[in-house]
């Protein structure tokens, strides 16, 4: 396979991954969609979805799951039986930025004042043991002039290799009578030695002091 063919295949797989992620993000917004992982190298092709409400995402008698399987197979240009969709439950939705962004969106659509909705999301992230949470709400929040308001609780890192593993980012938009409001949520995950709730490696500046008995 030539380098041009490899590049074309890589770009095609990336495009399919982005399109499928966008589809599931919209289709499962009420079920608390978190992430999607596409494993093209496996047989059958495996799509792993993480949601807050897996039972609702699967549907009664797996009806919705079969629908998703058919639509995904069409996009991947393979038979239905060549695609397997696995739905997993999010371990802690308070640590998922996308779920929190959509939570704020739903609250605003329900008539809740945006500051109150943001504070509720910050509290949820704090209770989930997040190291920090930053929420930016932009648009015509009050009056005719658009503005951005930033809320932050705890600490967040902004540079270094650890950002890609420790910072979880999610976006949502709300259409109101005044215009479109944008919501950006950034959550700094906790250090988790088991790698379930957060990265299994500590930050470079983390210092561990050993007891004298542990020093050889």
Curated annotation (Swiss-Prot):
GO terms for cellular component: cytosolic small ribosomal subunit; nucleus. Keywords: Ribonucleoprotein, Ribosomal protein, RNA-binding. It comes from the Eukaryota. Belongs to the universal ribosomal protein uS3 family. GO terms for molecular function: RNA binding; structural constituent of ribosome. Gene3D superfamilies: 3.30.300.20, Ribosomal protein S3, C-terminal domain (3.30.1140.32). It comes from Encephalitozoon cuniculi (strain GB-M1). NCBIfam families: uS3_euk_arch. GO terms for biological process: translation. Residues 20-91 form the KH type-2 domain. This is Small ribosomal subunit protein uS3. The keyword Ribosomal protein applies.
């Amino acid at each position: 396979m030539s380098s041009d063919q490899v590049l074309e295949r890589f770009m095609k797989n990336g495009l399919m991954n982005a399109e499928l992620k966008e589809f599931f993000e919209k289709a499962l917004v009420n079920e608390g969609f978190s992430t999607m992982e596409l494993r093209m190298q496996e047989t059958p092709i495996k799509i792993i979805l993480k949601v807050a409400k897996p039972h609702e995402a699967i549907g009664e008698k797996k009806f919705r799951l079969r629908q998703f399987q058919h639509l995904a197979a069409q996009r991947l240009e393979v038979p239905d039986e060549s695609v397997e969709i696995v739905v997993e439950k999010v371990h802690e939705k308070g640590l998922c930025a996308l779920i929190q962004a959509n939570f704020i969106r739903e609250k605003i659509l329900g008539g809740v004042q945006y500051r109150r909705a943001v504070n509720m999301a910050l509290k949820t992230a704090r209770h989930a043991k997040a190291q920090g949470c930053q929420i930016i709400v932009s648009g015509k929040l009050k009056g005719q002039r658009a503005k951005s308001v930033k809320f932050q609780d705890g600490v967040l890192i902004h540079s270094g290799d650890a950002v890609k593993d420790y910072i979880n980012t999610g976006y949502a938009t709300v259409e109101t009578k005044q215009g479109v409001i944008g919501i950006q949520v950034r959550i700094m995950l906790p250090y988790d030695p088991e790698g379930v709730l957060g990265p299994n490696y500590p930050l470079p500046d983390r210092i561990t002091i050993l007891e004298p008995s542990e020093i050889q």
